[in-house]
Structure formats: structure tokens, C-alpha cells
């Protein structure tokens, strides 16, 4: 259910919203704000996923890594 909410925007964002409506990309200020909120929600979801993956990576412990083996593997790939 839609809800009316009052917000205060500075001149910069007010002008940006107006330009988006005048360009024809959006039909109203509400459409611009909803689009912006969808982008923010998407960004926050991705950020939360990244944070969770970082935590899992840190908790998984140190990886077995041998620099010499890695260099040899790269060298053998270049020979092919």
C-alpha cells in the first residue's frame, strides 16, 4: 500500500529530479525517488553479500599457497 511521506531535498537534488522529469525519462518526482531507492536497495544488498562472503573467507582460515608452485604452473601454461 502506498504511503505519502514528506522529505526535504536540497536544491541540487530538487534540480536533478526536475531535469529527469523534463527529459521525459520519468513522469513524476515519485518515479525518480522510487528508482533511486531501488538502486540503493540493490547496492545495499550487494554490499551485504560481499560483507558476508568476506566474513566466510576470513573464517575459512589460511589457504595452502606455494609461490614457487604457482609460478611453475603459470610457466607451464605459457609453454603450451
From Swiss-Prot:
Name of protein: Antitoxin ParD
Read off the Gene3D superfamilies from this record: Antitoxin ParD1-like
An example of a GO molecular function for this protein is: toxin sequestering activity
Record GO biological process: detoxification; regulation of DNA-templated transcription
The encoding gene:
parD
SUPFAM superfamilies linked: Ribbon-helix-helix
Q: Which family does it belong to?
A: Belongs to the ParD antitoxin family.
Q: Which Pfam families match?
A: ParD_antitoxin
Q: Which NCBIfam families does the entry link to?
A: antidote_CC2985
Keywords linked to the UniProt accession: Toxin-antitoxin system
